[in-house]
C-alpha cells in the first residue's frame, strides 16, 4: 500500500487510478498462479468497467507485482492480452519486485537441495507445485512457468506490448527469492 499511497500523492486523482487487488489475499495465495491470475484479471476488468461507467476513459495501464504477485501479474497480462484489452488500452509499465520468474527449484548441489525441491513442491499446494515446476498446465503437459516463458504464448506476447518492463531483485541476502530464480 505504500507504493499506492506514494503514487496517489504524486499524481492528480483524475489522471491516475490505483487498484490494489484483494482477491488473492490471505490463504488464497496457495490456490496457484492460474486461479490467482484469473481472479485478479476479473478484478481488473471489473474496475475498468466501473471507471468507464463513471465517465472515465482508461487509456493506459501499468502493472506491478511483488514476489508471487509478479507471476500472477504476468498471468493477468496474458489474459488481458488474449481478450483484446491492449488493443484499446496502452500497456506502459510492467514492474516486478523479488519475483521468482524461473520458479524456486534449487540446483541439485546436495541432499538438502533435493529435499527442499521434493518437500517444497508437495507442501505448498498448487502454488508450490507451480513454483517448483512439477505441475502440468492444462493439456500442455508442461509446467505453467514454462508455458508462460514460451515466446509464442499470450503471456509473452502480452508482456511484449508494455513499453517498459522492469524487474528488481536482490542478488544477496534474499532467502525467499534467491539469485538463481
Language-model region placement:
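Short, surface-exposed "cap/lid" segments of acyl-processing enzymes
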Residues: 1-27, 80
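Short, glycine/acidic-enriched capping/hinge loops at junctions between secondary-structure elements
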Residues: 2, 31-32, 179
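Conserved beta-strand scaffold positions in the cores of enzyme catalytic domains, especially
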Residues: 18-21, 94, 165-167
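Active-site donor-binding loop signature of nucleotide-sugar glycosyltransferases
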Residues: 23, 99, 170
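Catalytic nucleophile-loop/oxyanion-hole region of alpha/beta-hydrolase
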Residues: 25-36
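Serine-dependent carboxylesterase/thioesterase catalytic core
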Residues: 37-152, 163, 174-176
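C-terminal catalytic-base region of ester-bond hydrolases, centering on the histidine
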Residues: 155-181
